Amino acid sequence: MIDFFLKSEYLPAGDQPKAIKEIENSILLGNKYQTLKGVTGSGKTFTIANIIKNLNRPALVVSHNKTLAAQLYREFKDFFPNNAVEYFVSYYDYYQPESYVPSKDLFIEKEATINSEIEIKRIRTVTSLAKRRDVIVVATVSSIYALGSPDFFKKSAREFFVGQRISIKEISDIFVELYYERTLINLERDKFSIKGDIIEIWPSSEHGEFAYRICLDFDEIVKIYRISSFSKKNLGATNSFTLFAKSYFVIPYQNVLEAIPKISYDLDLQCQYFKDNGKLVEAERLKQRVEYDLEMLRETGFCSGIENYSKYLSGSTMGRPYCLFDFFPKDYLLFVDESHVTLPQFRGMYNGDYSRKLNLVNFGFRLPAALENRPLKYDEFDALINQVVFVSATPGFEENEKSSVTVDQIIRPTGLVDPEIITRHSDGQMEDLYIEIQKRVALKERVLITTLTKKMSEDLTEYLVTLGVKAKYLHSELDTLERVEVISLLRKSEIDVIVGINLLREGLDIPEVSLVAILDADKVGFLRSATSLIQTIGRAARNSNGLVIMYYDKISVAMREAIEETNRRRQIQIDYNKKNNITPKTIVKKIQNILEKELNNKNKNISYDFEKMVSGEKLSKKKLIDKLKFELEEAVNDERFEDAIVLRDKIKELGSKISVARNK
């Protein structure tokens, strides 16, 4: 078994060693629930990484949105370069579920656009879990949605090895059985090609852009090579490789044959129910739709909306659908990041899905079995937990109630303390805010301002700009790349102020920010709850000059709770620093990322490569652009938007050079 190897320049510091030890001890004692209550910037991810390494168990880390999941994915990839770190989130770019609106007698067909790159990462996730134990999966709420049988997926594995007696046709039939398609032109992802006694396949389940080339002689495999998927360059020989299905919805044809009479039986029962209750239209509608699906299943083994028959096809006898949790070994560890938000999100998934599908069943569009293609109920999710660590700066009632151990992680390795909080009456707040901004600008520091509405953020930004402040607003109407560009401008000091609404959602941990101003801090609501206020205060906790100003009309209960908790933590941190002679230092975070440096280095050689390509000494430049476009798509799907911006600009630059050359 491969052990987890943690790569880091640093050792645990501050409260991290204590937190690691106490949580590990609790897990080793067999406790199911434990909580890591860590302040912003205390290195909770590094603590989790150390726990995974020390306990040496597979781990699932769940977050409440794709952006934060992507950040965690990148961090764990850096921490564990020699282990399988995977990413499992929704693969839909656009999704309109099948639904029926009785008041309008309107049936809406399912429409979806699947993101192929995220789908690849999902396949890699289940493949890694089927092959090895040293796996860390970072996921979202997608982890509780229905998947195929893990047993069927594992049994789909086929090994190919040098010396194996097998024909080209037999290999081809196996590939087709595993849902791979043959291509007669260029080799593409999840397809295979045959040329004489050579068969090549590019499985997306493999990490890295490479394919396999199998060479046969008289129905015997004599050589297996790994080759570059783009250039076909030989990357070296291998004695064997294992191929899994390209889908985690593996359905043996025998299961399809066995399911058909069960579906027919339930169809007769439901049609009779409708007729007995005078619903003749519903009975006829259901009969037509299901009989058409049955005919497709008999002829092809597939039908549109086959997921609605998963109860019959999956072989599950558990009374619930399979999901990602079922692909993990029994001793896995679960980490719920930002649990105060993630747990309520998981709790709410089932009800919304159920109410939509119930209409489809009641009006004869689907059999009752369609209700079983669903996300898990919360108690089912809880039952699948082996041992869990809830991770949050502000744990909710459930975490506090269930946990055998709650460990505070208050001391930051950097020595930084929670920001000072000042409360000021809202009278004259605009003038006061402008003065505070000017103070920060003079120190070359940045400012975040949080409002309650989009209109307020836009109006305040416009007002500040008229006063000569370099400011931009940030809210959901900006697309993802635009939001990243605004954050990048702030870090580069091209603007000094960002005005936003829910700055927590943006994941704004920017060390240059020394002032967070909270307008209408006393208003009642989610964005001004004690939990949200504490989280917002944390945005100023990465700078040694951190300050938070709350503007109010009347100090609220939530304000008082947030201030008291922050001051409690702040005093503990100050006392620790005095005792250990620590001087807090602002976190230094490089603005230029690693990929941007790599691309700059690549760019130095682009003109050189270009000249050689023009003279016929290199491959076509189109392939280079295709490669960069592929990297761009991966960057966007991984939520590495700063990288995506850099790649986009390089592609544009390279493309313009090509057009100039063609016009010469």
UniProtKB/Swiss-Prot annotation:
Organism of this sequence: Borreliella afzelii (strain PKo)
Gene3D superfamilies for this protein: P-loop containing nucleotide triphosphate hydrolases
Q: What is this protein called?
A: UvrABC system protein B
Listed Pfam families: Helicase_C, ResIII, UVR, UvrB, UvrB_inter
Q: Does the keyword rRNA-binding apply?
A: no
Q: Which GO terms describe its molecular function?
A: ATP binding; ATP hydrolysis activity; DNA binding; excinuclease ABC activity; helicase activity
One cellular component term (GO) for this entry is: cytoplasm
Describe the function of this protein: The UvrABC repair system catalyzes the recognition and processing of DNA lesions. A damage recognition complex composed of 2 UvrA and 2 UvrB subunits scans DNA for abnormalities. Upon binding of the UvrA(2)B(2) complex to a putative damaged site, the DNA wraps around one UvrB monomer. DNA wrap is dependent on ATP binding by UvrB and probably causes local melting of the DNA helix, facilitating insertion of UvrB beta-hairpin between the DNA strands. Then UvrB probes one DNA strand for the presence of a lesion.
Q: Per the record's keyword annotation, is DNA repair included, yes or no? A: yes
Which stretches make up the Helicase ATP-binding domain? 25-170
Residues binding ATP are 38-45
Q: Which gene encodes it?
A: uvrB
Family membership: Belongs to the UvrB family.
Keywords annotated in UniProt = ATP-binding, Cytoplasm, DNA damage, DNA excision, DNA repair, Excision nuclease, Helicase, Hydrolase, Nucleotide-binding, SOS response
Record NCBIfam families: PRK05298.1, uvrb
Q: Tell me where in this chain the Helicase C-terminal domain is found.
A: 429-595
* Cited PROSITE patterns: HELICASE_ATP_BIND_1, HELICASE_CTER, UVR
Where along the sequence does the record place the motif called Beta-hairpin? 91-114
Q: Where in the cell is it found?
A: Cytoplasm
Query: What the record says about its domains?
Result: The beta-hairpin motif is involved in DNA binding.
Name where it mostly resides. Answer: cytoplasm
Domain named UVR: residues: 622-657
GO-annotated biological processes: nucleotide-excision repair; SOS response
